[in-house]
Amino acid sequence: MKKIKWFSIILLLAVAMCGLAGCGENSNVAEQPIQEGMDYDVIVVGGDPEGVCAAVSSARSGLKTLLIEDDEALGGLMTLGKLNFIDICESRDGSILTQGLFMEFYDAVGGTAFDVETAKQFFYDCVVNEKNATLKLNTEFIKPVMDGDTIVGVVVEENGEQATYTASRIIDATVDADVAAAAGAPYTVAGEDIGEKERHMGVTLVFELSGVNWDKVVDYLENDDNEGTGATDKTAWGYTREGYAYEPKDDLMRLRGFNVARQDNGNVLVNALIIFGVDAMSEESKAQGIARAQKELEYIVPYVRENFIGFENVELAGTASQLYIRESRHIIGEYQLTIDDVLENRDQWDKIAIVAYPADIQPTAGQTYGTVIGSPDRYAIPFRSIVPLEVENMLVIGRSASYTSLAAGSARVIPVGMAEGEAAGVASAYSLNNAISFRDMSADEAAIADVQKTLKKQGAYLDDFEVHEAFMEHWAYPGVKVIRSLGLLDGGYSNDYRLDEPMGKWRLQNMINNSLKKTGSDFALVEDITDPVTNGNMIAVAARLADVEADSYTGQLSGLQEKGIVTEEILNHMGTEHEAPMAAEAIMIVANLYNYYLAQ
């Protein structure tokens, strides 16, 4: 493990608490000289909310901090992407779990929905009011500066020229983990970890409308006898039927229900337009996606006038300059958060945030709807998940941190990354003050306890917890975990896997084919499941796939038992040959068949 030699260090007497209203300067921090030969203690690359939190946290911890952003303003997706309807991390009892710096933002901008210009100013003030922070806008990351496997700085382009800045610690807050990837950290792309590298999850272009009659919107959505719609003085959600009824001119577009948030000027921002076929790693593809969406809006706006109550007189006032992209790289760190961590509400010994959000997988081309794998009450983000493998002196925060692709469906939301950013700043101070690497910290209980103690003082919610889910007691849950981990089983918002319902033909056939495809094995696609499904037909198909040479039902069962595909527990729950299998039995058999193929 490489360690940079210290020449002059003054230990911090206290780490500053985050309690300032409006992000004013925190004067209660000790001055600390940087390491000899370094320009800064910490460089944060990426000015989205996650990066702002990291930079502010680092600066308040007494570290000389540089924040680099390649655009003209801070806030990223929330400001330039105009996504002003926050995905709040709430537990089932309604408690907001992300506190600390996130709550400073939440309180300052007025809650769940906010004015974009207000947010933009807030983020700017947060950084420039910190005496230990330096902000560089319109500054593009070009490449990392490396000393072996240790990152010691970044090369950037500013004012048309390249410049190099060095630091003892680097925090990658870019949305695609560009710095970590360039430095050599391992990663997967999209759903690569479950055999879906080429999937391009739908992206969104937020658009702005003027001329909305808000009183009519509220009256309609509050009285349409639909529990899933509603409106407040600032937000509205609904028009699902109207949205999905729109027939796009571009086949790679979908309009869905509206999530709407008002601006201070009376206009509204709408999150509803899904764009397919956009490669999140290609600037050209993203630019084309924006252009295609803007063209489609020429047809959408007249449709909205004719079909959306309260929108009869709207005009298009503009669009975001950035796409809302939900997935690109997934860095591999000391620990990868899994979908089981999320949906089993797991605590972590090294937690730096407690969060909650449904595991929401957006549709891809050809799909009308996305998938909700499940919905947790709460779970913990471990420090290990922001420590990338193979690169020293770096942390990675935000949606491209170390989560599996399914777990990222939940952990990708902005408040999670903001909490990680605050923790990254505190961890950087601990790392420098104690001459310990991030990697060593990730295995050091005392170090993590110190970081957690500081975060709690600053307002973070990090209490230990234990939340148990009833579905985990089901006898077939081991099979659920296998199939769910492949992205082939969803429980929706209520975590209902329909285990005790009869298994349908298409559900079973698709589950078999798609799970076995993910093993990389050659097999004949299953196309002969009967409708309705019987135990006899299901067992015959499984026997054929497992090369069991038997014609009778009992012979096939015996052969599958020998291969571990049918177990005594499954037999104890199965009915007769001619009865329909419940989903529980079918899922267990498919899971065992998948594991059998993997072992070949």
What are these regions (language model features)?
Residues V145-T164:
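Conserved beta-strand-loop-beta-strand element in the redox core of flavoprotein oxidoreductases
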Residues C18-G22:
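C-terminal motif of bacterial Sec signal peptides marking the signal peptidase cleavage site
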Residues G24, Q162-A163, A167-R169, A177-A449, ...:
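Flavin (FAD/FMN)-binding glycine-rich loop and adjacent Rossmann-like elements that form
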Residues G51:
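N-terminal Rossmann-fold NAD(P) dinucleotide-binding loop
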Residues I34, S57, L63-K64, E69-K143, ...:
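Conserved N-terminal/central alpha/beta ligand/cofactor-binding core
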Residues S485-Q600:
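Terminal recognition/anchoring or ligand-binding modules at protein termini
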Residues M1-I10:
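Bacterial N-terminal signal peptides that target proteins for export
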Residues E36-D48:
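Beta1/beta-strand and adjacent pyrophosphate-binding region of the FAD-binding site
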